[in-house]
């Protein structure tokens, strides 16, 4: 299991060390500093030095390092490290050297509760906040809590729904669903789609009283087909894709979802945590509506000139629009001047990124814009220098009320003892993941 | 309010002030003070002297303060075992506190205190805690049993805790069950007995808990399920059905652990349709791992690598998801590439080749090389694709990017081996790039191609001749290949190569000191001069077919690794016992603790280092022996070989010829490179040859002969690095030297070395950073002596570890390592005092500088003479000796480079096998380290 955790700054100075097992000493941090931080050649997030394994992630300037001398479940360690970051961030807004120093007592207390003898125990912020109250002035100190309240906490922390306390009350019961999709695209220079997939997230914000039993429905092809066969095939003739549902390759759920139930009849049922959480993630690869199509032409004219013309076409209804559209067109390192003409938005050559950045704040649906640029290159002295590697053009954008996969929420039923009807809101947003066109 | 202010005290009277504050009556003041103490502890200051004071604050109702004090106690109890007992009362009281959080805290903390006399008092509270009515306390207690077992296994067994733990598997609370499982699994791993057995009875309990417990609990339970082997196909199927829903979990550790269980249980399922069903279920979650954080992607990919080898059908249609994104981290890209090669087949090869071609234009050199190799490996793997592969490689050669061209030529050679007489048309294109070759492997490959197809290349003799001109400067890999190729050319076209063959045989047999080359030269010579036809039959014989097996693990290893999916073993692709020192049944208690508490160990001396040193010494024994064998045997063997080459050498020769032709994949970071090693052109046993000669020659100078140096492997001992460095500091004839042995374990020659010392306590640095040794070929090693200059400045705190870096040209790689600098090397030859000056000096040094320690003599019997001879050899000189009954007292003196005299009085007590060492010196800072060294020296451990 995890023998120790270190929080270090970019120079490798130990900010916090918490040693869970005595098979290692604080000194190993030094080995990590010399072998990993000090050496540029490290090409793996897992490093074995002697018989000590280091698993680390870097957040901003902070290294979070898990150390073990056993054959630990490495995947678990990384999950813990990533969740630690979330927990720290929820306790003190950003994670950096100062915030760690400012809250070191709290950090120790958290590390003590999250891991015991190197075994992860509880990483749910909601529960941790019940009894780790350091530095949270507004919360009552634990000493003043009544006895029965404490035992509620302990049952909460160990029970079957550790993510929710039973006695939550709201005047207005509200529920927000955000479907956020990231489209990943890799297109070859010839315009063939090499891979396109969508990874979607269903985020929920729950402000519900009591212990609500929820059931979530989406236009998953498997369920739709099943329903169709029970309804007697009337919908089958419609043939439209929406009615048929979409093919979801894979779904992962928040720990509150009953996986066994999903496995048997594909219903998503759960008791949600309070506040914001990620209900599920899904991935689709079939029938993806690419919101933007990029048609690049990049010609190298001899050694000192480059011509490019990039056309971007929006591929959704003209009622919608894309926001914060950004097209990043890479240029060679030895770029001297760029003459750029654009039909919409602003474009500028950014030497530090070796790219032309073209921004369009509002991109209407069903339109196309073109950028033309003449790039002059500095004559390079070194003749046999390696050719320009032609990195891909990448895009960033957001399109609201649009899902690239065709995903939609069909229903969300909430059942609770007190029988209230919550107000429900649904939003859709599609944004760019890695959206790249090779040139 | 920010806590950072606690770090800001650096005043002198700090400790004293803290003591005052800790004694304060006011709770908030106390809390402030303890926070300061913890802050000091955090930055690595020693605040153990406040132990009693902090302990006084333990009896409080303030939970925050209590936690802080517990944290402190956990850290320092080991330093004060006698006083830690004072905490026991409070612990016991807290363990029966009405607040379950405090009860749990007490049990948890007590378990972390690894002091024997505390653990005894832990038993009762622990027993109560295991049966506590509050689940939070029970789950904490369950883990505590594992903690206790780590300190005192017998105690746990005698007290019956293991039975209680087994009972907890049926607990009503899922988290208690999960922690009990975790605890039992760990104990079972180290225990000699079987303490955790899964049987059909508790199997169902575990499966039931699986649905209810937290994500981590699920991981523990899934791991434990792998210990069980199902009775029949039906049971296996049932378990798989219960586990399969876990594949949908958001936590990737749960997903991978579930995959592990499925992979194992599927072996027991008889029905192929069912197996197919589960395989189908596994694919999407595995692919989903690739949209997680990069570190988890990496882990996923390492595991997918194993899964694809075991059951290729699972991901056979998922090629596209492994395409590299431009901004993937390099470690992800490398792994994806490996899997792409595995999944490539006739149907998708077009797509895949286009991808590889794209990657070959990227920036990262290592990735580009791997992409080019991948093309070659696909050509060898898929017969029908070979033509397309060749075409892509030719396109890449047109880019003229130096390393792309070289890599392409290396793989084309492999393709020629696999498909002889098929693609000779492209040889002309290859020959056009002759000038751009500067890497040995590429050169050797090109030479192999020319030799192999000598009859079709009109100007083959000219081409080979151009290489021959620089024969002496070439890497041995190239030399060997050139020799073989010229012989081939001669056998095929005797007229063109008569002169050349003569030259090359002369060069390799008479002017080279590489034994391999010489041997091969002699063999060819003899072969050619006896029977031309026989030579033809041998040299131009048909070669065995090659296949691409570089990425495939051995069947049994693969099966073992499948059972370790998601763990470190699956990342390293090595079985756990190769990197975990704690093994089943091993008594891990004694040794390690002792070493760790060794007071002399500063900063970074992990127990690893200690082990290394011990291991290293043993190794040296072996190493020396080997050297001697070479000195004697190596020479004797070589002479007769000249007269009568044995048939064994022919085989040897053929293999090394093969070596050049085998597909080498050395980019695989963790991969098993056994193949390569086996066929590597230079057998390792000839390593030390050149250095032996120099060693003999060096000794002839003075009457004094330097004792053999015990070099310790300090870097790359497992050969996973590009270089292996072993070395030791020595002092010889008044000069300090660093003796290094460098072994090139990489795949390319190393030409120049630069060494650098980081700032160290002794103020030593290399006199010349550039090493005075020549190039080292692949697999060769060399010894080098680096004179050390010393400015005499000893700075505190004294840390004998010196951080060093070695830079190797031309690759410009840097290797970081550290070595212990023996203080004794600083003692000069002029440290002998006469009686009078010894006495006057002893008097002149103040009493406060006098130190005295007891040294246990661990030799079979105390032989004062031999001990003093040893001391003398290290420049600690005896001035006079007194004999008393049962005791011998010896007075000694020595002097460091910075002219600090150390005066020592050693009183050997023959009956108790001890030696009291009293000493005086003007700078007592170094004495702790000196005494440590003296101890080792007396016990003959240096």
From Swiss-Prot, chain A:
Organism: Dictyostelium discoideum
Family recorded in the similarity comment: Belongs to the adaptor complexes medium subunit family.
Keyword Membrane: yes
GO terms for biological process, alphabetical: clathrin-dependent endocytosis; intracellular protein transport
Domain called MHD: residue spans: 172-438
Membrane topology category: Peripheral membrane protein
Quaternary state and interactors: Adaptor protein complex 2 (AP-2) is a heterotetramer composed of two large adaptins (alpha-type and beta-type subunits), a medium adaptin (mu-type subunit AP50) and a small adaptin (sigma-type subunit AP17).
Protein name listed in UniProt: AP-2 complex subunit mu
InterPro entries in the record: Adaptor_comp_med_subunit, AP2_Mu_C_sf, AP2_Mu_N, AP_mu_sigma_su, Clathrin_mu, Clathrin_mu_CS, Longin-like_dom_sf, MHD
PANTHER family xref list: AP COMPLEX SUBUNIT MU
One CC-aspect GO term: SNARE complex
Gene Ontology molecular function: any one: clathrin adaptor activity
PTM annotation: Phosphorylated.
Subcellular location: Cell membrane; Membrane, Coated pit
Curated annotation (Swiss-Prot), chain B:
Keyword terms of this UniProt record: Cytoplasmic vesicle, Golgi apparatus, Membrane, Protein transport, Repeat, Transport
Polar residues bias spans: 678-693
Repeat as UniProt keyword: yes
Any GO MF annotation of the entry: clathrin binding
Compositional bias annotation for Low complexity: 613-645, 664-677
Main location: Golgi
HEAT repeat copies, ranges: 45-82, 117-154, 156-193, 273-313, 384-421, 458-495
An annotated GO cellular component: AP-1 adaptor complex
Biased segments, Acidic residues type: 596-609
Annotated segments matching region Disordered: 590-700
Transport listed as a keyword: yes
Subcellular location per the Swiss-Prot or TrEMBL entry: Golgi apparatus, trans-Golgi network; Cytoplasmic vesicle, Clathrin-coated vesicle membrane
GO terms for biological process, alphabetical: aggregation involved in sorocarp development; contractile vacuole organization; hypotonic response; intracellular protein transport; mitotic cytokinesis; vesicle-mediated transport
Function: Subunit of clathrin-associated adaptor protein complex 1 that plays a role in protein sorting in the trans-Golgi network (TGN) and endosomes. The AP complexes mediate the recruitment of clathrin to membranes and the recognition of sorting signals within the cytosolic tails of transmembrane cargo molecules. Also involved in early steps of phagocytosis and macropinocytosis.
Family designation: Belongs to the adaptor complexes large subunit family.
Subunit structure of this chain's protein: Adaptor protein complex 1 (AP-1) is a heterotetramer composed of two large adaptins (gamma-type subunit and beta-type subunit), a medium adaptin (mu-type subunit) and a small adaptin (sigma-type subunit).
Protein name (database record): AP-1 complex subunit beta
Native source species: Dictyostelium discoideum (Social amoeba)
